Amino acid sequence: MRPYAAHPPAAVRDGGGERAPEAGAMTSTGAAGGTARPQQELDDLLDRAAIARLIDRYTLLLDSQDEPGTAPDWPRSIFTHDCRLVFPIGEHHGLAGLGAFHDAAKQKFSATHHLSSNHAIVLDGDRADIRFQMIATHVHRPDTRRRAARDPGPLFQVGGYYAGRAARTADGWRFASWSFHVVWTSGTGPADLD
């Protein structure tokens, strides 16, 4: 096995011996078969990367929002001021009370673990349609298990997807409309314990 080369041979860099495009040359085609501007492609990549980071921040905050050091106004770094959320547990509009809305759901469990994947981002100027898969594991609180008529077991899991729209703001990309769609569950959820 060859060690990793910091500078691959020219044949690898330029596609196996084909001539590498000149700097500034238009090299890719858009969906309609026309040529795309390299700067637009770069801007699109940067926007997609920023939105992917937004998704990652949100996914991490779902699990860490109640940990010491997390700013109580964390939703401002994720959502627009007029955001609209539609979840199986309820709906919320605007930033006011949004942290408490998320926290109330999380406090039903002693811990949560969210995993996201397959981030589909479709740019439309200063807006973007987003969809990604989510698997969330929720660890029931010991007192919840003791109080239940029938022990729900240690875990409640949910698989589904988030879908919504993001908007470019003065502070960067933020979710403007956001919803979660359940595809499957495993275990007993809080609604079945109340």
Predicted feature residues:
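General secondary-structure edge motif
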Residues: A31, P38, L54-I55, I78, ...
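Glycine-rich, flexible loop segments associated with nucleotide phosphate handling
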Residues: L62-Q65, G69-F79, A149-G159
